[in-house]
């Protein structure tokens, strides 16, 4: 009885091994066919693309020649005929450009289809345990809760201040309107104005009562904030709108409570108190 079971197991293993070998052989054959035929198909498309490009260059030269004749021609009838030639040449150049785009699209689809075909065939040899692990990982990734949008508690470290300055600097660069087109510049200005209005009148959020408060307004952190460079500042962080800032200033910056004559200098009395504490 035991011998029959062993023979059945051996037979099943042999069948599985034979089936796997057959699938592997088929995969290798299909792979070789795809790899061998792909260069020929690509070369044919490249040759067609080169021919279209030559015709396109000839058409552009024809357009230049006709346009030069048109500028020098004084006869109205002759100018009208040249206009028709110029129009036909422009239409021809557009058609050639469309054909070139179509050929390039065909080349891209050809490569993608071959790669997709090989990937589909390779799944036959994937380890079942590995497939199960990949499936479980995908389920875990999809079931993870979304990250909280609440700003983390700020700490009094130079590293956190630098990171805040870097983030504000990047956002400030995005807010500056580019000098390309008037329409884009107007849209940028509208978005920047709307952003400033949102910062001036923040929306009521579900606030944690234990969350720390900052700024002169004694509210929680939101939007863009800047840190006072006075290490002894009791408030430390300020909203841009509360201190009349639209972008992060260069160099050091002191809050209204710690500054001296201007926002770049510290109050002398505050600086003196700081030195006295160090001497103690």
Swiss-Prot record:
Residues 122-204, 258-280 are annotated as: Disordered. This is Inhibitor of growth protein 2. The gene is ING2. Belongs to the ING family. Widely expressed. Higher expressed in colon-cancer tumor than in normal colon tissues. It is found in: Nucleus. It comes from Homo sapiens. Seems to be involved in p53/TP53 activation and p53/TP53-dependent apoptotic pathways, probably by enhancing acetylation of p53/TP53. Component of a mSin3A-like corepressor complex, which is probably involved in deacetylation of nucleosomal histones. ING2 activity seems to be modulated by binding to phosphoinositides (PtdInsPs). Pfam families: ING. Zn(2+) 1 binds at residues 215, 217, 239, 242. GO terms for molecular function: chromatin binding; DNA binding; histone deacetylase regulator activity; histone H3K4me3 reader activity; histone reader activity; methylated histone binding; phosphatidylinositol binding; protein-containing complex binding. Keywords: Chromatin regulator, Coiled coil, Growth regulation, Isopeptide bond, Metal-binding, Nucleus, Transcription, Transcription regulation, Ubl conjugation, Zinc, Zinc-finger. Zn(2+) 2 binds at residues 228, 233, 255, 258. Residues 130-140, 258-274 have a biased composition (Basic and acidic residues). It comes from the Eukaryota. Gene3D superfamilies: 6.10.140.1740, Zinc/RING finger domain, C3HC4 (zinc finger). One of its GO terms (cellular component) is plasma membrane. Residues 48-120 form a coiled coil. One of its GO terms (biological process) is spermatogenesis. Induction: Induced by the DNA-damaging agents etoposide and neocarzinostatin. A zinc finger (PHD-type) spans 212-261.
């Amino acid at each position: 009885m035991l011998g029959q079971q062993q023979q059945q197991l051996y037979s099943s293993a042999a069948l599985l091994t034979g089936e796997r070998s057959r699938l592997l052989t088929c995969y290798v054959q299909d792979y070789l066919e795809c790899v061998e035929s792909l260069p020929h198909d690509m070369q044919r498309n490249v040759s067609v693309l080169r021919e279209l490009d030559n015709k396109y260059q000839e058409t552009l030269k024809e357009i230049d020649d006709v346009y030069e004749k048109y500028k020098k021609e004084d006869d109205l009838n002759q100018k009208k005929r040249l206009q028709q030639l110029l129009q036909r040449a422009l239409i021809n150049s557009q058609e050639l450009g469309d054909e070139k785009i179509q050929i390039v699209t065909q080349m891209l689809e050809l490569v993608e289809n071959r790669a997709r075909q090989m990937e589909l065939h390779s799944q036959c040899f994937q380890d079942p345990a590995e497939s199960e692990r990949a499936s479980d990982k995908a389920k875990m990734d999809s079931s993870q809760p979304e990250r909280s949008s609440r700003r983390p508690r700020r700490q009094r470290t130079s590293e956190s201040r630098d990171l805040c300055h870097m983030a504000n600097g990047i956002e400030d660069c995005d807010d500056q309107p580019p000098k390309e087109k008037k329409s884009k510049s107007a849209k940028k200005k509208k978005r920047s104005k709307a952003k400033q209005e949102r910062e001036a009148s923040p929306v009521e959020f579900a606030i944690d009562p234990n969350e720390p408060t900052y700024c002169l307004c004694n509210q929680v952190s939101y939007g863009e904030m800047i840190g006072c460079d006075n290490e002894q500042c009791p408030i430390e962080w300020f909203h841009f709108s509360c201190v009349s800032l639209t972008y992060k200033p260069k160099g050091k910056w002191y809050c209204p409570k710690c500054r001296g004559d201007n926002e770049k200098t510290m109050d002398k009395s505050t600086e003196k108190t700081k030195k006295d504490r160090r001497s103690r």
